[in-house]
Each structure stands twice: as structure tokens, then as C-alpha cells.
């Protein structure tokens, strides 16, 4: 299949690995202190483990896993608020499948469904809007989450709801923005991040120019990369070349999909419906400044929290779990004491084990046979 198979060709992968090994000899980094490349996308993390790319790297280069999975950073209190709304009579609560099993303090949405709440999996926000139109006597809530990748679809759905004057449709907002998160990571002392592989999907919307501050303010190289083995390895080569040349630039490996200016139509829809306002809590990371997303005044009537007024929930993460350290690249999934025993895909303790794009779920699926210390 064009654009898939040609980016997985084993002989080309091994040629690129050999080239990477050769160029890595020119790096000042060693096995004891490798060049630490953070991939900031759950899709990248999954691909790295699936294809074993981290095991093909030179010993002085290391992939570390960042907070690029929106399901993985869902705070427990937000799940509890969703359960409270979903459990009310007359409510149909809709969300994506990955969010169903994320544990809150009072269980998960899947467990709420088992207790009798009308919780349904949808594949797009438009599915939830259609449910609202088909059930005018019910209140339908769509739990929208994700980075800028999914925000345009939510924005277009809310535009449709407004144009059709649907008055029983509500939106519980858990959209978050990527760039403040990267700034927050880099502001942490001794963050240990030398370079970034930026997510292709988010970049398709926001473009590459939005990352300029990472190069100019923090002097870190960044490459926007695709999701196939050759994409990721080529992205690593580009970062190595920047490091050798002592450059800090934003480069685009994924030009077949990502224009430097992004998607202006998607950006316009987002600006119409959403505003960046205030701080947002991230599971495992705490509160991140300026990462919150709210509805603009024209769409306030669809705000589920304003309509249902769930009790404010602030739940602290269990200190036994090391989710925050995994999300910031400070430890590997298997180094968490709960990994595979208390926390596994069948009985997830943390959100990183729930989503297929979570670092812990990917490690469990592809590396659980390894007994690393």
C-alpha cells in the first residue's frame, strides 16, 4: 500500500539504521549520557515499541516518552465529574472508546455504564449530535478530549448544533493544547530533554511554525515526523545532524502531510468555537499554565459543566504510581512498582495503561517478556 509499505521496507530501514550509527559517532554524547530524544505523541510511542525502533538506536541515543496521549493525562476528578453527569436521569453520555476505561476516584465510565448509566461509545462528535436530534426528550452530552488534532471536529459539530438550533446537546470540554505543555516540560530544571520529535497529527493542524519558540527560546532541535519506521528514523537522523552542527531549528520530515502553515480552515473553526483560557490540570503533571480550553461566548449554551453543574472534583494521584515520571521521560514504564502486577491492561491502575497509545500499554504489549531492571 503506497505511503505505508514503502515507509516500512526492511532493507531501507536497516540502511537508515546503519547511517544513523555512523553519524552518531560524531555526537558528543555517550552511552552513559545519551542524546535524549522525546517523542511527544502516543502514536510515535506505539510505533517505536511495535517496530522495536528503540532497540535499533546507537547506544548514545535514547528515545524518551512525553505526554502526547490525551487520554493518559485525564485527571481523575474530570472522570468523576463525567460519571456524575452520566448517572443523572435522562442523560445520554457519549465519548470515545479509549476514555471509557480511564479510572477516576469513583470508578470508570465503563463501570458507570454497568451500574445503569446510559454511556455510549461514539466514533465522532457528529454521532453524538445525531443522537441528540433523534432523542429530543433526552439530554445528550459529548465528552470531547484531545489535542488540536480532534478540536476541529468538535468545533464543526458545535457549529452544526448551533445552526440547527439543537437545544438538548451539550459538550463536556477536556480539550488541551500541546505547546504550553512543551514549554512546561522545558521550564522544569534538569528536564534532560535534548531534542524533540513532534507529532504529525497535531502539526497537520497547527503547522510547524508554532514550534519556533522551542528552537529560539530553549535552543532545542525539533523535527515534525510521521508514524512509520522510516519516518521516525529519518527524524532521528535529522535531529542528530542538527546536534552535530550545533543547530537548534524546527524541521519538517512529514512534508507529505504537514504544511508549514498548518490547516487554516481548521484553525479558523477552532478560533470561532474555542478560546485558550486559564490553566488546566493534567494527570501526573499537575496544573499547566495557559493550557486550558473553553468555549467562546457564542457557544456557551452548549457547555455541559455550566448546565449540569457537577460538584468540583480534585483528586490527587496515588503516590505509588510513577505516571508523572513516565510522562516526562524521567523513568521507563517497567520501572514503576505497579507495572504489570497491580497495573495492567486488564486492570489498569493508571491512564497510561488504558490507552493503546499510552507508554505503559505499549511497553506491556511489546516488552512485557523482558525482565529489565
Language-model regions: role of each:
Residues 234-325:
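Internal helical hairpin/lid segments
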Residues 172, 190-259:
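A conserved active-site cap/scaffold subdomain adjacent to cofactor or substrate pockets
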Residues 1-137, 151, 155, 159-164, ...:
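Metallocofactor- and cofactor-centric catalytic cores in central/energy metabolism, strongly enriched
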Residues 143, 147-210:
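Phosphate/pyrophosphate-binding betaalpha-module
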Residues 6, 72, 143, 147, ...:
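Hydrophobic alpha-helical scaffolding
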Residues 92, 139-141, 195:
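Structural motif
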Amino acid at each position: 500500500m503506497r505511503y505505508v509499505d514503502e515507509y516500512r521496507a526492511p532493507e531501507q530501514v536497516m540502511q537508515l539504521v546503519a547511517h544513523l550509527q555512523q553519524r552518531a559517532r560524531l555526537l558528543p554524547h555517550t552511552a552513559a549520557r545519551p542524546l535524549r530524544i522525546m517523542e511527544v505523541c502516543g502514536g510515535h510511542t506505539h510505533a517505536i515499541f511495535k517496530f522495536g525502533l528503540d532497540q535499533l538506536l546507537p547506544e548514545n541515543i535514547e528515545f524518551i516518552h512525553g505526554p502526547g496521549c490525551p487520554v493518559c493525562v485525564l485527571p481523575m476528578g474530570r472522570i468523576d465529574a463525567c460519571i456524575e453527569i452520566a448517572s443523572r436521569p435522562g442523560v445520554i453520555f457519549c465519548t470515545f472508546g479509549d476514555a471509557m476505561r480511564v479510572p477516576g476516584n469513583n470508578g470508570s465510565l465503563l463501570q458507570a455504564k454497568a451500574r445503569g448509566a446510559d454511556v455510549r461509545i461514539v466514533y465522532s462528535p457528529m454521532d453524538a449530535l445525531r443522537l441528540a436530534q433523534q432523542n429530543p426528550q433526552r439530554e445528550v452530552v459529548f465528552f470531547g478530549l484531545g489535542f488540536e488534532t480532534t478540536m476541529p471536529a468538535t468545533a464543526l459539530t458545535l457549529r452544526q448544533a448551533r445552526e440547527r438550533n439543537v437545544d438538548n446537546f451539550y459538550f463536556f470540554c477536556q480539550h488541551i493544547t500541546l505547546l504550553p505543555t512543551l514549554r512546561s516540560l522545558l521550564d522544569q530544571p534538569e528536564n534532560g530533554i535534548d531534542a524533540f520529535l513532534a507529532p504529525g497529527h497535531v502539526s497537520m493542524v497547527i503547522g510547524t511554525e508554532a514550534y519556533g519558540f522551542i528552537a529560539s527560546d530553549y535552543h532545542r532541535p525539533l523535527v515534525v515526523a510521521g508514524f512509520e519506521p522510516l519516518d521516525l528514523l529519518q527524524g532521528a537522523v535529522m535531529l542528530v545532524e542538527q546536534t552535530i552542527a550545533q543547530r537548534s531549528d524546527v524541521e519538517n520530515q512529514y512534508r507529505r502531510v504537514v504544511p508549514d502553515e498548518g490547516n487554516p480552515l481548521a484553525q479558523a473553526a477552532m478560533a470561532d468555537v474555542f478560546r485558550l483560557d486559564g490553566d488546566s490540570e493534567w494527570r501526573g503533571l499537575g496544573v499547566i499554565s495557559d493550557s486550558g480550553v473553553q468555549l467562546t461566548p457564542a457557544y456557551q449554551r452548549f457547555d455541559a459543566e455550566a448546565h449540569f453543574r457537577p460538584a468540583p472534583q480534585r483528586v490527587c494521584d496515588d503516590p505509588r504510581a510513577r505516571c508523572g515520571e513516565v510522562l516526562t521521560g524521567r523513568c521507563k514504564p517497567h520501572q514503576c512498582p505497579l507495572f504489570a502486577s497491580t497495573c495492567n491492561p486488564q486492570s489498569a491502575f493508571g491512564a497510561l495503561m488504558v490507552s493503546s497509545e499510552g507508554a505503559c500499554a505499549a511497553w506491556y504489549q511489546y516488552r512485557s517478556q523482558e525482565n529489565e531492571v
